[in-house]
Amino acid sequence: MQKTTLLHEGKAKKVFLTGDSDLVIQEFKDDATAFNNKKKGTIADKGVVNNAISCKLFTMLESHGVKTHLVEKLSERDMLCRRLDIIKVEVVVRNIAAGSLVKRYGFAEGTVLDKPIVEFYLKDDDLDDPLMNESHAVALGVATLEELSVLRDRAEAINVVLKEFFAQRKLKLVDFKLEFGRYHNEILLGDEISPDTCRFWDLDTNEKMDKDRFRFDLGGVEDAYGEVQRRVLEQD
């Protein structure tokens, strides 16, 4: 399968059309951004690492009955995907208080939540991806109540699977972002699952092993991404 026209370029990936109108190729870049594009940089081989991790996790989730956009891994940086009509809702699942949850509500960082929190954000860079509820999403026309219910249920189910998977690899899944899209009357999981979209802390030391190392200039970014990749793929 070959790339044809560039369909979309985002902060971390490019999406290309192919000869099949139902399929696209997602190419992972090394570009890194934070704080809604206010901080920019590069993480060496990030695209290679995130593609490998995402392909592994999508395949694992498929084995648990979660339908995703992954068709196959084409190369180190390229993933063949079903072409989705992306729902403009970012779904964030939080297991441990960190990031904006701490800033917005005053949780102490590291507080283990009694029950995971599921949040919806409007996928709109110009508006800085604002937090929204179901009523906002429906009023904006980005999703129906029925679709939002599916997104919430799917995100909670994915969280159960991912938490167990990462715990077996000595990683705490602090929180993560998911994106979904419509595909022939189905809703599929899209985008990626990687240290760009998840917060991972080492199970024993609570060392941050994700994009927070880039956000807050903690150093060792490439090493952290590589270590997550090693643990995710260690049983392959």
Swiss-Prot record:
**HAMAP family per the record?**
SAICAR_synth
Q: In which pathway does it act?
A: Purine metabolism; IMP biosynthesis via de novo pathway; 5-amino-1-(5-phospho-D-ribosyl)imidazole-4-carboxamide from 5-amino-1-(5-phospho-D-ribosyl)imidazole-4-carboxylate: step 1/2
- Biological process annotations from GO: 'de novo' IMP biosynthetic process; cobalamin biosynthetic process
Q: What is this protein called?
A: Phosphoribosylaminoimidazole-succinocarboxamide synthase
Q: Which gene encodes it?
A: purC
Under Pfam families, the record lists: SAICAR_synt (PF01259)
Q: GO molecular function terms here?
A: ATP binding; phosphoribosylaminoimidazolesuccinocarboxamide synthase activity
Q: Which Enzyme Commission number(s) are listed?
A: 6.3.2.6
Q: Which family does it belong to?
A: Belongs to the SAICAR synthetase family.
Q: Which UniProt keywords apply?
A: ATP-binding, Ligase, Nucleotide-binding, Purine biosynthesis
Q: Does the UniProt entry include the keyword DNA-binding?
A: no
Q: Which PROSITE patterns match?
A: SAICAR_SYNTHETASE_1, SAICAR_SYNTHETASE_2
Catalyses which reaction(s): 5-amino-1-(5-phospho-D-ribosyl)imidazole-4-carboxylate + L-aspartate + ATP = (2S)-2-[5-amino-1-(5-phospho-beta-D-ribosyl)imidazole-4-carboxamido]succinate + ADP + phosphate + 2 H(+)
